From Swiss-Prot:
Keywords: Cell wall, Cell wall biogenesis/degradation, Cleavage on pair of basic residues, Glycoprotein, Repeat, Secreted, Signal, Stress response. GO terms for cellular component: extracellular region; fungal-type cell wall. The gene is HSP150. InterPro entries: PIR1-like_C, Yeast_CWMannoprotein_PIR, Yeast_PIR_rpt. This is Cell wall mannoprotein HSP150. It is found in: Secreted, Cell wall. PIR1/2/3 repeats lie at residues 71-89, 97-115, 116-134, 140-158, 164-182, 183-201, 202-220, 221-239, 240-257, 258-276. It comes from Saccharomyces cerevisiae (strain YJM789). Pfam families: PIR, PIR1-like_C. GO terms for biological process: fungal-type cell wall organization. Residues 1-18 form the signal peptide.
């Protein structure tokens, strides 16, 4: 009798394990199509913000439409599901993107009218963010992830998609984002010389009483100067270039000049190829928005088309078409567990699809890769860089 019980127990255990394992190696659970120009490896940790798409627009024009629509944050609760709350407050146009936060069970949720909502625990043990909290100094609803890995996103935020990224704080405590300028504007001083600074962290180039141009040390980008024959010169990669003065009284920057800008016979100033290459490198980053990272923010990494959260769980589209994090391995019956990318427009995509759907579930929205009912509306999941504020 004992022997029979042992066999039955072993059989049940084997059945349970077999039921959990995906039907094939999970890393091969990927769509057949890929997004043109999509990035499958992203160097840094990022979050997502929900961007509603007009229901009257087609998928091909969705990116343009989304830029003028509301920005909504997604949250993740403990079971890995991605969800969003309703009735979030409006966001300043200078706001950084809304961060997605993650709680214990892996579900992603966002509260209403706050970016730092109080977190509560419901009867089944899942942790969820509350609605209508009024936390101070908020500009957008934060997305959170609870323990089960589900991802949730907020509704009714009113900020356009930002193209600026760096975050600063003004006197009244509000957080503002500046643009990702690749080079400073070129200016001309009184004696006709042309100057330009790029991403300097030290003092700008100044002009003293006799009209000479001087530059301070510890600049991260070299100032442009003009020597006696009218040519414009600029140094590159100077981190602490000392300033020297030549016999004609003009000031020039010293060493580590790779290629000087030159002036051709018609008076036009030409930049070096190194400068244009630097600008091109900056423009290849598809993510053009940032958000402050807080406790519980959904943090994701993308490598080789596989999406993971801060706990190492696998981002997948499960059997009911919901986007959530589980495992590894991903949840049994998962449809896709690989094939993720960030599109050239900065949106998260699975295969060749960057349109997801937020579907109302109580006070939150769950996220799906397909339209599954009348309570669903199309959205983009905008990738956002996360920074410590």
């Amino acid at each position: 009798m004992q022997y029979k019980k042992t066999l039955v127990a072993s059989a049940l255990a084997a059945t349970t394990l077999a039921a959990y394992a995906p039907s094939e190696p999970w890393s091969t659970l990927t769509p057949t199509a890929t997004y043109s120009g999509g990035v499958t490896d992203y160097a840094s940790t990022f979050g997502i913000a929900v961007q509603p798409i007009s229901t009257t627009s087609s998928a091909s024009s969705a990116a343009t439409t989304a830029s003028s629509k509301a920005k909504r944050a997604a949250s993740q609760i403990g079971d890995g599901q991605v969800q969003a709350a309703t009735t979030t407050a409006s966001v300043s146009t200078k706001s950084t993107a809304a961060a997605v936060s993650q709680i214990g069970d892996g579900q992603v949720q966002a509260t209403t009218k706050t970016t730092a909502a109080a977190v509560s625990q419901i009867g089944d043990g899942q942790i969820q963010a509350t609605t209508k909290t009024t936390s101070a100094k908020t500009t957008a609803a934060a997305v959170s992830q609870i323990g089960d890995g589900q991802i949730q996103a907020t509704t009714t935020t009113l900020a356009p998609k930002s193209t600026a990224a760096a975050v600063s704080q003004i006197g009244d405590g509000q957080v503002q984002a500046t643009t990702k300028t690749t080079a400073a504007a070129v200016s001309q001083i009184g004696d006709g010389q042309v100057q330009a600074t790029t991403k300097t962290t030290a003092a700008a180039v100044s002009q003293i009483g006799d009209g000479q141009v001087q530059a301070t040390t510890k600049t991260t980008a070299a100032a442009v100067s003009q020597i006696g024959d009218g040519q414009v010169q600029a140094t590159t990669k100077t981190t602490a270039a000392a300033v020297s003065q030549i016999t004609d009284g003009q000031v020039q920057a010293t060493t580590k000049t790779t290629q000087a800008a030159s002036q051709v016979s018609d008076g036009q100033v030409q930049a070096t190829t190194a400068t244009s290459a630097s600008a091109a490198a900056t423009s290849t980053d598809p993510v053009d928005a940032v958000s402050c990272k807080t406790s519980g923010t959904l943090e994701m990494n993308l490598k080789g088309g596989i999406l993971t959260d801060g706990k190492g769980r696998i981002g997948s589209i499960v059997a009911n078409r919901q986007f959530q994090f589980d495992g590894p391995p991903p949840q049994a019956g998962a449809i896709y567990a690989a094939g993720w990318s960030i599109t050239p427009d900065g949106n998260l995509a699975i295969g060749d699809n960057d349109v997801f759907y937020q579907c109302l579930s109580g006070t939150f929205y769950n996220l799906y890769d397909e339209h599954i009912g009348s309570q669903c509306t199309p959205v983009h999941l905008e990738a956002i860089d996360l920074i410590d504020c």
